[in-house]
A protein has these predicted regions:
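Serine-esterase "nucleophile elbow" of acetyl-processing enzymes
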Residues: 2-71, 83-90
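Structural recognition of the beta-strand scaffold that forms the well-ordered cores
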Residues: 26-29, 64-69, 93-97, 135-139, ...
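Surface-exposed cleft-lining segments at the edges of enzyme active sites
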Residues: 36, 68-74, 103-115, 144-149
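Catalytic-core regions of hydrolytic enzymes
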Residues: 70-92, 108-120
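Active-site microenvironments of hydrolase-like enzyme catalytic domains
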Residues: 92-107
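Active-site segments of SGNH/GDSL-like serine hydrolases
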Residues: 97-101, 124-156
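Charged, glycine-enriched surface loops/patches
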Residues: 113-138, 162-170
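Catalytic His-Asp segment of secreted/periplasmic serine-dependent ester chemistry enzymes
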Residues: 140-240
Length: 240
């Protein structure tokens, strides 16, 4: 897909590509949240929901949707393994959700400042655009800071994603703001499996926000998944 280098142009080109015949390669990367292990208890993760919407309901059966996220990783890990994580897949669209581990303090790894994190995000965007692909930045979802105090800086890192998206004119999916809204400004308990990993309903919420931001909503008789995910989120909020 040609390089557009602005969020508005990227969205327009993506919309055109979605109604075209040429297959697209989608790379979804990040940390444990995107990796999608354990915390959904066997239910689909948000990349898997995206796969169903793109290759099922949108009927883009020749598209390839690849999840290269790895639990515990930071943005620096993705940049250091760029070939395997992104470049080798010859992507047309690359989505990134990272920051939950970058924001952590007190562990064995060197602490990262929001400024260093933002610089790495900028590097990521430049590299993606250098491949001729559309970059998509997602803020990490809001968490239960009281029970994960080592990640108390998560809001600063979400703000850094927003700044980079604005400065570099990148499509932004603000999952942090969405989770905060779903929790009415507090922790959205029904969407979390632990203080910072979304559960199956949380992944439904992530998938809905990403689907909406990228204009992926299918229309007509095949449009089933979005309504199902909306129901899952509503039910989880009531239980939470």
């Amino acid at each position: 897909m040609p390089n557009a280098e602005s969020a508005t142009a990227d969205l327009r080109r993506l919309a055109d590509a979605l109604v075209g015949a040429e297959p697209l390669n989608w790379v979804i990367t990040g940390d444990s949240i995107t990796h999608g292990l354990v915390h959904t208890q066997g239910v689909r993760s948000y990349p898997e929901h995206l796969h169903e919407i793109i290759r099922g309901e949108r009927e883009r059966v020749r598209d390839v949707v690849v999840n290269t996220a790895i639990s515990g990783h930071r943005i620096s890990d993705i940049l250091d393994d760029w070939g395997r994580r992104v470049e080798s897949w010859r992507p047309d669209v690359v989505t990134l959700m990272i920051g939950t581990n970058d924001a952590a303090t007190g562990g064995e790894r060197t602490e990262v400042s929001p400024e260093e994190y933002a610089s790495s995000l900028h590097d990521f965007v430049v590299r993606v655009r250098g491949l001729g692909a559309v970059p998509v930045l997602q803020t990490p979802p809001a968490i239960d800071v009281a029970n994960a105090p080592e990640r108390a800086r998560i809001g600063e890192f979400a703000a850094a994603v927003r700044r980079v998206a604005a400065d570099d004119h990148v499509i932004l999916v603000d999952q942090f703001a969405r989770f905060a809204a779903l929790g009415d400004g507090e922790v959205p308990w029904g969407l979390m499996n632990d203080p910072f990993h979304p559960n199956a309903a949380g992944h439904a919420a992530l998938a809905l926000e990403l689907t909406t931001a990228l204009g992926l909503h299918p229309a007509g008789a095949r449009s089933r998944t979005v309504a199902l995910l909306e129901g899952v989120v509503v039910a989880a909020r009531l239980r939470g």
